[in-house]
Structure formats: C-alpha cells, structure tokens
C-alpha cells in the first residue's frame, strides 16, 4: 500500500535528519525558540468559511504540480484569500522540503501548518524550529500512545495540531483522545482513491456536541 511505503521511507530518512542536526540540538533549538506562533486554530475557528491554501510540488496521485510560478508569487496569491497555508515537507513522494516552509515563513504572517508524515518527536521539534505554527498528525499511521505523545509535545511547544482521519474508527479514536482540531481526508491514504462522500459521513454532530 502507498501509505506503508511512504512511512517506510520516512523511517529510513529519520537517521539522516538526526545526523544533520542531533536530537539534542533540535530539541534545544525548539525549546529556546522565542518565536510567537500565529494561531492555526483561531484562523479556522473564525466566523464563516476558512480557507487553507496548500503549497505542494508533487503527489503520488497527480505527479508534478503546476510549477510555472515562483514560490513568492504563489504565496502572494494565497495571501489575498487564504486564512492559513499548508506546506508539504515530505521529500520522496511529494517533493517537499523544510526549506520551502522556512521561505514561506519569511513571506507571510499567516499561520503555516507543516504537512508531513510525522512519526517521531524530532519532526515536531523541527516544525517549531523551521517556523511552522501547526503540524499534521495522521491517525492512520500512529497508535493512540504515539499519537498522544506527539500531540502533547506539539502543544507544549505552542503548536496547534490538525488530526487527520479517514474513517469512522479513526474519528472515534480522535474523539476519545479529545483532540481540538479534526480534519477529514476524502482520500484513502492506503489506496489514494478519493471519495467525496467521506466527509459527509463523518460530519454529523459528534457525541461531545450534545
């Protein structure tokens, strides 16, 4: 399955990241960071429709994206209507980079979410250091224990967390964990097929809505 391959590749890359900047150093940089985060949660919670514009170079399902305009031009366009920006940092399958997020941080005050396949605390610390205001955690690739560990770490660093689900079981897990922000992905990450009805199935009032 595609998701398994992506996670396997991420596991292979983690030692490379930690060799470049050690876990101890990345942790120190994140904890000592005095950067004030822009609230991703507030950007979504405001009245009316909220738009998250995404910077993505490629994807397994669509190949290379439209790269005819510069990053600066694209972020300028996003700033005209977006409430937040999503930046892909996964290298092998989406051609992302932490460098893109660093550059975007210099171009905008909009909240930025790091979109990646986060499986290790190192990646959360790194998100803080490179300028992200939030991180994506995908329920399908994390058990509850690791999910809670990464979730709590993110909030301790002043980062919001978008918790991604695709089915009823994942939705219930997130409700049980009492997470703050849940995003429903219409794309099945195991097959990469899209079903637009997915979000409709799981957007009825949740038990905690009364």
Tell me the role of every PLM-derived stretch.
Residues 114-116:
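Short beta-strand elements of ligand-binding domains
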Residues 104, 112, 127, 174, ...:
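Hydrophobic alpha-helical segments that mediate membrane insertion or helix-helix packing
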Residues 45, 101-106, 128, 148-155, ...:
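Surface-exposed amphipathic alpha-helices with a cationic face
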Residues 119-193:
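Conserved anion-binding
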Residues 1-101, 106-110, 119, 161-162, ...:
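Conserved N-terminal beta1-alpha1 strand-loop-helix module at the mouth
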Residues 202-210:
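Single conserved hydrophobic/aromatic residue that forms the stacking wall/gate
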Residues 85-86, 112, 135, 182:
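Hydrophobic residues within beta-strands of alpha/beta enzymes
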